[in-house]
Amino acid sequence: VTAGDSSIYAAPGEEFTRDQALMAVMLQSANEMSVAVAEEVSGSVKKFAELMNWRAKLFGCKNTHFNNPNGLPDENQHTTAHDMALIMKAAADNESFQTIASTASYTIPATNVSGGDRVLTNNFSMLANNNAAYYQYCTGGREGYTEASGSTLVCSAQKNGIPLIAVVLQGTSGTTATEAASLLNYGFDNFNMLSLGDNDFNMLSGGDVYVPVGTTADVLTTQDGEVQDGQYSRQYLFGGTAVGTSVMAATQEEDTSLVDTSVQNIDAARNYTENRNNLPYFIIGGVGILLLLLILLRIIKIAKS
């Protein structure tokens, strides 16, 4: 951490609670607190970066590598928009993260070193209703800037029950929120949720897919996984693109004649996945803090259980 990086100006030896550290990282993008959290959890920044990379792989990230906990410039650190979307999805699904992300302000009282309060204000422009970049459907996110990465932003939003994620990398300062809003508006205007609950028997979970407006269930094809413990997963494809899954109960009466496992559709799904992963690398920027928060929230949850 160097002069000019986002900080709450914590002093050496100053003591903070876990909640205070979380809020400092999320609301103020406090880089020194990110390093302190990494060292507290793993003993060193290097060890924590290994934990971050392991966790990123669990989320499905294939083209991301962390070398520090805050996303500041490092020649061995990179990501893609697709991978950042996967990390943001995990964050959006985490209730504790969403609570922190939606906090407008938080006060850290006097510590063993500081005699006064620190008032932390949420600096994410898309959530601040007094900011020109405010986006009413936004549910959380992060933005950051370094000279190396340019402006970066990841966010989640929900409108009419449809959740979306937008990622902007290597953006121009002051425009990334507008660009993210444009991406979200395009998604909300051109895609909707199609419920397949009435089209399948013995559906246990899932069955909601996101497809272009006007799409009907009869144009979707399906692929079924292997039966395990009396259940199997069914993947729905639109034009060879995977758009959703459901968990089905395996019964003797189940009609498998509707299952489309043609080589053409399998190859289309595989090619789609490969094309999405063959993406250019970008410098992570400050949005790497998201994964740090998810790891710490996971550790806190385990400690409380």
Annotate each PLM feature.
Residues 1-82, 86-95:
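Active-site-adjacent loops and short helices of periplasmic peptidoglycan-processing enzymes
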Residues 61-62, 73-78, 82-305:
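Domain-terminus/edge residues, biased toward the C-terminal soluble/receptor-binding domains
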